[in-house]
């Protein structure tokens, strides 16, 4: 009798076990398998067997993650508008000066970061409204819109950290006062990037280094 009862219960228990693709989430980022995957040729691409990782925190909570993405998007849009007005009325003296906003690396990188947060929020909202199968882990192939957000992540994360290093290491003079705009665009940007990297489940691949390098080369050519 006990054997029959156990057989009838086991299927119910198995239904509640996570699928195989979710079990690999428990693999730590310090494991040998993780580092092997980092340097496989396939890691140059944008395919990933767990698209649901792009829709949640490290510990899950996809709905709260949507709120986080909304706050990040609103904050960065507000900041880029405010900093634009501050630049317009603080150092520009002619219409030609106002156009120069677009030639500065800081402004480009912050605009890129803002675009990334907006794309994240829209992609995640689409997943919650239309593609709930992605959030639940029901698919194992990356949709195009998540690939786009992944590229924007790579570009904005690297660009923000680079701008912070260049400003504080080579541009800013010790003892000189720092404006609110400079502090937000050269410190707040990297603070957000590091925080987001720590709490978001979105994977990072070292072999995606060529993406920000391509943008850097393009900027150098056109600003030379």
What kind of feature is each model-predicted range?
Residues 2-224:
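Aromatic-rich, lipid-facing transmembrane alpha helices and their immediate juxtamembrane interface loops
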